[in-house]
Amino acid sequence: MKKAFGVVILFVGLLDVARAAAESPPPQFDAKAAERFAKLALACVAKEYPNKISHVLNSDADVAPPRKLTPAFSGCYDWHSSVHGHWLLVRLLRTFPNASFAAQAREALRKSLSAENLKQEAAYLRGEGRASFERPYGLSWLLRLGAELREWDDDQAREMSANLRPLEDMAIERLKAWLPKLSHPVRIGEHDQTAFGLGLMLDYARTTKNDSFARLVSDAARKFFLSDKDCPLNYEPSGEDFLSPCLGEADVMRRVLTQVEFTKWLTDFMPQIPMTGNPPSHGPGAASGDWLKPVVSPDPSDPKLAHLDGLNLSRAWMLEGILSALPQDDRRRAALQAAAEAHRTAGLAAVTGAHYEGGHWLGSFAVYLTTQRGIQKEGTTSQKKNGASEKAGP
């Protein structure tokens, strides 16, 4: 009986935390916040241990420390977190070029993204039995890093981009060979989710004007998701999710459909989004985000249970992405905005660095959200050719 009572108290306590987070004003993103996130990445990109290797051994020669196997991306606990930890530093240097962390971030990037290190990374990927290595999650983040470097008008960035290019090209070839063979999408809330990977791939293809890759990715998204209806959002989340299967799907489809197409598709796909209410800041009668409430990790020190802290962040950016593709007079905007703000507040509050289990990756999710990286405002010809949303901004 005491045990059951304790569980009830814990559950109520978690609800109170989520409710308080949802009612707080959204945190300001400025140079101070950027420094906090940069410190998380700087603390891990060169931190080799602890390390979780996803590694196929072909012989005794493959038994080696991470710094020998993948010298560019041997920190931050695992390969994909190291990749997006480096992306975080590039993104923040572009956003705050004169910040206090700039010199340290540049030096960390210089050491990691050297030509020699990245040649070794490419050799590792070519190893026998590694065709599925970090596919699609890590490879998609690698493309996000590559695109960020290409967009940065900076001499060091151009050098690092050239160093990364062979690995980048290898990732594209891997994904181009894999996507046509993928018979069904992977609809989970973790690394293998197809929708999230497709979104990163498509953003890369459009940034780099790789039209053939953009068409392949857009066609895959349409094949997998265009006929979907009534996504069971009430079944989310699973206990170890850091991505939303339903929102992730909507977030990639707003990239490949026109505004008119997406507005109709979303009605069929997520009919549970409330249709009434004023924006959250408009006083009495304002829309509530209660239709999709933030979650709380029951144990941020557990590497899997800490995923729920990241779920709040990714839900927030996916909700904002959906908003960016809807007409200004769409009656769902207020409810979407309310839910996005609640998740943003709860998600950013959890990015503390108190536990390495979350500290090695949550900063990247926070920066992806706060810099609106997933909402590309450049209406390029490549985007229009491949069915980009007609409306670029939120």
Language-model features and meaning:
Residues 23-74:
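Low-complexity, Ser/Thr/Pro/Gly-enriched N-terminal "stalk/linker" regions
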Residues 26-31, 66-83, 123-140, 181-194, ...:
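Solvent-exposed loop and edge beta-strand segments that line ligand/cofactor-binding
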Residues 206-282, 286-361:
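Long, repeat-rich segments with strong aromatic
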